[in-house]
């Protein structure tokens, strides 16, 4: 029988280590229930050369307002941990926990997420921030203010290979940025 630790025990603890499993991750199927997501996702799936945009589309819809149940659970956790010395290790790669107000240096996502990119070939074992100009253009396409043709796939500045989201499912996943 599994014993759940009462909130009072957490409040009395000097240090709290929180482990969050992949079950808390926003599922692709739930995103497909959002009308505009489904339409854009279908367009991208039809064109092989545009599939690199799919992770950006997913990132756009990983906002609290689209996932109130998961966001609510994280907000409750934040209340419980208020004023505590804590550290969170989350196997979820949806980055939703990063937008709740936790101290960023107290969160690690060893399976990656949607905030950093890496070379698809992992040529230099380094991470890159998602380019703000590219992100704004992708948002423009999602919001129907620019065309899909205006989006250019990001490339590694070192070797010219594609830049991909730094996530566990990538063939050359680089975990160094999260350790």
PLM features: residue spans?
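Conserved catalytic alpha/beta core of Sir2/sirtuin-type deacylases, generalized to analogous enzyme cores
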Residues: 1-179
